[in-house]
Amino acid sequence: MSLIVDILIDDLRALIRDLGQNGGLMSPSVYDTSQALRLYPTPSEEHVWPAVNWLISQQQSDGGWGNPSMPLSRAVPTLAAILALRRHCQRRSTFDGLLEAKRFLRRQLEYWEKPLPDNLPVGMELLLPYMLEEAYREEHQDDIDDVPIKLRLNIPLAPYRELIALGEHKRSLIQQKKPRAGTAPVYSWEAWASHADPELIDGSGGIGHSPAATAAWLFAANHNPNLRNEIAGAENYLRQASLATSESAPCIMPTAWPIPRFEQSFSLYALVTGGILDFPSIQDVLKPQIADLHQALKPRGIGFSDDFMPDGDDTAAAVAVLIAAGYPVDLAILNQFEREPYFVAYHGELQPSISLTARAVHALDLAGVDISRWWKIFIDAQKLDGSWSGDKWNTSWLYTTCHVLIALKNSPYKTAMKEAVAALQVHQHPDGGWGIINRSTTVETAYAVLALQNLREAGLLDDDDIHMLQRGYNWLCIHYRPFRMKEYQCWLNKEIYCPQRIDRAYELSAMLAVTLGELKL
């Protein structure tokens, strides 16, 4: 047992030391890569084709792009990929793939005829109408020289009626507010603006910390000599952003970058959920990170980078970490994100988030605040099968359920928690792991193990539940590879993505929580 502890601690120490380096790590994005290829490709052909080939390799067997577990997240990357690949269609197989993508979009229309759910991907009400407009514009612009094929999509707009109306409302609100650089609306700049305003460039050198928005801004700037310095900075931003992905290839872009505070606050929060923040062997690398997080937390909160506006999710994670580490924190910093009955990431949000609210409530619980008034929110949101799902920031119900159970573990709602444990029991795969795609994944198994370990420490598990926990822990041990991060995309933004270091922090925290817990018994 001591050997695995030593290995896990060494791995965790290396992870903590690297948090926030080079702006953070992020999985590659189909949407942002497609937009960069379409709107502002690198002039070097040797860099374009790796991105084209990568895009082609990401197409699913049903013809679409994106994770099949989240159908509503797939239309935007699929449309973006179609429009980008039309310009680079030199093989019959690519053309056949585009035809399949066209059929996929037709089949997907049924999802958009239903009422819109709360877990729409970020900016979907802006991005999908924008991509539909772009597709319509290109189809009726026959003189586009760099489009070798004409692929008539002929997508009916009626099924998107509710989304388009929501988008028009959102655009009008944005235009009234005239957003500043480094604010949430600018993250989706490409969907509501067309004038290359240099005032919107933030400290990263890009637009809204978004490769897609930055590529669109560069396209709009059209090599304007009066914007020479700004254009050079934005081009450098795209080069640096491409280095943040696991592909590390020019033109292959993440969905957001830089994300150092998101990576730092959420990774350290994962340690809090595992109860290992005070473990002696990590303090020399941990304390500088926590001290850095403390100085970064301002009265308005903290964002996913120092150059982006504060949000409630990163703020809740940071506050929880600092309180758990013994730092004094003014809770007004967190409470400003409360909008009855939830906590919000950004003021003016249209959909609430259960996971964000759970994290904020957990932070308040750590601070000794009476959190009983929030318990009923979680109980009312519980599904009939005992789980919590439908969150706007993560597609996995295991993520949401994990964080709600941690927020509820000191509550009197034992029946609700037992029902959630029963849901975990039902959905555990025969191999002992968990995953929403009919196979076990590391990060989702880590969520389940962390939830169960927290309930075990609260005395809420029976022998069968502990056996379930042990099977999940064994699965993590069998599939653990020291110093090698896995990539499974279940976080939700403009499209589904994976912040690798954060997921690794959850994995290591889950394994250490159980391992150290066993040593205490």
From Swiss-Prot:
Its EC number is 5.5.1.29. This is (+)-kolavenyl diphosphate synthase. One of its GO terms (biological process) is diterpenoid biosynthetic process. Keywords: Isomerase, Lyase, Magnesium, Metal-binding. Belongs to the terpene synthase family. Mg(2+) binds at D311, D313. Signal peptide: none annotated. It catalyses: (2E,6E,10E)-geranylgeranyl diphosphate = (+)-kolavenyl diphosphate. InterPro entries: SQ_cyclase_C, Terpene_synthase-like, Terpenoid_cyclase/PrenylTrfase. It is an enzyme of class 5 (isomerase). It comes from the Bacteria. The Asp-Xaa-Asp-Asp (DXDD) motif is important for the catalytic activity, presumably through binding to Mg(2+).
